[in-house]
């Protein structure tokens, strides 16, 4: 039934990688089952032979999905099936998309969909690397015009050594988590989080990862040669040279002048007007022309105009030199009721960032195939349409917002205090209120400021900067603090976050081949200078965490009880702790070792909660008098609570000096009384006396009662 499948196995670091095709999903354009030490991923590629008429973009979609059966689990929740992609799945989909997208021809507009499904998981082998490898293999045997294959490698920095594809266990002790992907000749994508590593160490890790993944690229080429899928007979559309010349004649000079307007919205308006006028003029000359084709040529001309000016050494779009950072404005404490806030403005990019402190109960529970964990540091990035002067749909976060938030979080993670040092869950929200490039790096700067304003003891200030590149032949210019247009029209987006001591995050996306180690070194060094300049300005506004947290933030008080007393504080079905929280207005968390954390915005509430817990956990002593409350009345006496929930019996004979016929004539449920502990038996039952407590506390009254008898 099946033709003989093609299988390719090779050693990659400490792992054995296997690629297989020919058995599953035979109606797809291409499909590969890939495995790396029991972590298996199935990747399919479907590409349409024809593009949609008039389509002016490349519709590439990457879907990454983790099936719970891969880990031998059934999904939680009511529906018991996987739902919308998690944040982790979205980030992995972006990780796959970024290095493959620039390898398709710019004129290729056919729809391509990649679906990657994790079908088996080894908890110590992250599926993202094998998924990238499988995607590269599937595209390489699909016959589509794909200028690959690519390789992928994760690099760790453990005990001063670079480690290829470290396990999840090893990563816990690594100062670096770096993913690098590229072709045989060039690096295309880098995503990393680091603990203040130097520029030289980061560059060495990138080069190391690229060198190591040559094994993968060689294996995929051999795999593709064995599969031998015929290539598509796709050719780029022939460019209308006459129309291109007409467009250049009408628009080149005007576009060059327009790109000397430094204000973004005014420049956009002028460029838009020029394009509309050129389109109208050409359509008047020849109605048969395609407006989309004209606009495509105008876009290419616009790109060429901007790039030519930069290569020629002219000032940039907004008048800056290549290594200049835009004007900075830094403010903290801008919102009165938030726990911490900052407004960070860099040119026409602005972020309003807030920090909120919560208890450990507020931590994000992440339930992935690799297991469950809690995240006590959350960073959410919002990019509303108004920040670029547009209208648009406002709803759940898009892939880009999730990705930018993760990058900003990576930049800050290395300086965050541990939960033991600062027992709070911290949520940061970055609202981008203006955007003209590098909003994720503005979020890094704003987050550092807002955390300090909130009193979070971060280890150092962190700043981020986005670098760009324009390369024509052997000539190139590295740009600091790029604008949105420079990002769009340039060849590289290179984002670096870090402290004065080193780099904490690095993200790089390269659109062309030929980015050398020399260029990356220049970009890193130039970024270091820009980062330190920004840090100097930030430190003038606030250089360390405030001495105290906001008066509106919960204050966490810690106390310790014996672990065998935990059940007393919790109570039956959680009744005691629930009542404590409700009646004192606090949040109480109890750990297995008896550590209790009490969070309250008011000191008096915390003190009351502590007093009551101490009361509950205190040992009842024979002979001592305690205040109590009547809980139940029975024929032979009354049950009274002492020291919180502890309950003892006051026998009818121990209520008063005189003889009592009915307990209810002397005591009522809810009545507060003073009781003396007479005895605690072997079973822990407490015998109490109101009569003796009264005699000790009010001896005169007790004597009068005896005399009356």
Swiss-Prot record:
Quaternary assembly: Component of the RNA degradosome, which is a multiprotein complex involved in RNA processing and mRNA degradation.
Domain KH: 554-613
Protein name as annotated: Polyribonucleotide nucleotidyltransferase
UniProtKB keywords: Cytoplasm, Magnesium, Metal-binding, Nucleotidyltransferase, RNA-binding, Transferase
Organism lineage string: Bacteria, Pseudomonadati, Pseudomonadota, Gammaproteobacteria, Vibrionales
Cofactors that this protein relies on: Mg(2+)
Domain S1 motif: 623-691
Catalytic activity: RNA(n+1) + phosphate = RNA(n) + a ribonucleoside 5'-diphosphate
Gene Ontology annotations of biological process type: mRNA catabolic process; RNA processing
């Amino acid at each position: 039934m099946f033709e003989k499948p093609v299988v390719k196995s090779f050693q990659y670091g400490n792992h054995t990688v296997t690629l297989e095709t020919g058995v599953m999903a035979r109606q797809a354009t291409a499909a590969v089952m890939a495995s790396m030490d029991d972590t298996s991923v199935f990747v399919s590629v479907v590409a349409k032979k024809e593009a949609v008429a008039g389509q002016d973009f490349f519709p590439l979609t990457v879907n990454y999905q983790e099936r719970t059966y891969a880990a031998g689990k059934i999904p939680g929740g009511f529906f018991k099936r996987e739902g919308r992609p998690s944040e982790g799945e979205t980030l992995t989909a972006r990780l796959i998309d970024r290095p493959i997208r620039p390898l398709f021809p710019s004129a290729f507009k056919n729809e391509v969909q990649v679906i990657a499904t994790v079908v088996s998981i080894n908890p110590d082998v992250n599926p993202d690397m094998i998924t990238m490898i499988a995607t590269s293999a599937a595209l390489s045997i699909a016959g589509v015009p794909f200028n690959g294959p690519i390789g992928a490698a994760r690099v760790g920095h453990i005990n001063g050594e670079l480690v290829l594809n470290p396990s999840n266990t090893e990563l816990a002790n690594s100062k670096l988590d770096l993913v690098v992907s590229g072709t045989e000749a060039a690096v295309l994508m880098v995503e990393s989080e680091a603990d203040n590593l130097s520029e030289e160490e980061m560059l060495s890790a990138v080069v190391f990862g690229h060198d190591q993944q040559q094994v993968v690229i060689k294996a995929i080429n051999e795999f593709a040669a064995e599969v031998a899928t015929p290539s598509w007979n796709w050719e780029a559309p022939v460019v209308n040279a006459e129309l291109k010349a007409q467009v250049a004649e009408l628009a080149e000079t005007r576009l060059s002048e327009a790109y000397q307007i430094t204000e973004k919205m005014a420049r956009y308006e002028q460029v838009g007007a020029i394009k509309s006028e050129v389109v109208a003029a050409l359509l008047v000359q020849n109605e048969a022309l395609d407006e989309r084709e004209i606009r495509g040529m105008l876009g290419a001309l616009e790109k060429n105009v901007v790039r030519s000016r930069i290569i020629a050494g002219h000032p940039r779009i907004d008048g800056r030199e290549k290594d200049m950072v835009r004007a900075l404005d830094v403010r903290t404490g801008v919102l009165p009721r938030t726990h911490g806030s900052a407004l960070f403005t860099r040119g026409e990019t602005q972020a309003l960032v807030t920090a909120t402190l919560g208890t450990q109960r507020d931590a994000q529970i992440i339930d992935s195939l690799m297991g469950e964990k809690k995240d006590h540091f959350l960073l959410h990035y919002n990019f509303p349409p108004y920040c670029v002067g547009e209208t648009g749909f406002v709803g759940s976060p898009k892939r880009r917002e999730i990705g930018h938030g993760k990058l900003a979080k990576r930049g800050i993670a290395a300086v965050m205090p541990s939960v033991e040092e600062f027992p709070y869950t911290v949520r940061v929200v970055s609202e981008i209120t203006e955007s003209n490039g590098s909003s994720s790096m503005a979020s890094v700067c704003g987050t550092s400021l807002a955390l300090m304003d909130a009193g979070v003891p971060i280890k150092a200030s962190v700043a981020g900067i986005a670098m760009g590149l324009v390369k024509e032949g052997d000539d190139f210019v590295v740009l600091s603090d790029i604008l949105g247009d420079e990002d769009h029209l340039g060849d590289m987006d290179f984002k670096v976050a870090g402290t004065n001591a080193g780099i904490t995050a690095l993200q790089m996306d390269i659109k062309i081949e030929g980015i050398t180690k020399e260029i990356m070194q220049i970009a890193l060094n130039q970024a270091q200078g820009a980062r330190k300049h920004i840090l100097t300005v930030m430190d003038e506004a606030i250089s360390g965490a405030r001495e105290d947290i906001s008066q509106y933030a919960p204050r966490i008080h810690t106390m310790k009880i014996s672990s065998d007393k935990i059940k007393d504080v919790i109570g039956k079905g959680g009744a005691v702790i629930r009542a404590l929280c409700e009646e004192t207005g606090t949040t109480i968390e109890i750990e297995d070792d008896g550590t209790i954390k009490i969070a309250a915005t008011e000191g008096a509430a915390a003190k009351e909660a502590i007093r009551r817990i101490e009361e509950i956990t205190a040992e009842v002593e024979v002979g001592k008098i305690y205040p109590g409350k009547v809980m139940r009345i029975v024929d032979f006496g009354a049950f009274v609570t002492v020291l919180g929930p502890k309950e003892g019996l006051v026998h009818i004979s121990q209520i008063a000096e005189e003889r009592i016929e009915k307990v209810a004539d002397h005591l009522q449920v809810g009545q507060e009384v003073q009781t003396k502990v007479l005895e605690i038996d072997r079973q822990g039952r407490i015998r109490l006396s109101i009569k003796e407590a009264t005699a000790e506390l009010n001896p005169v009254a007790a004597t009068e009662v005896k005399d009356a008898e």
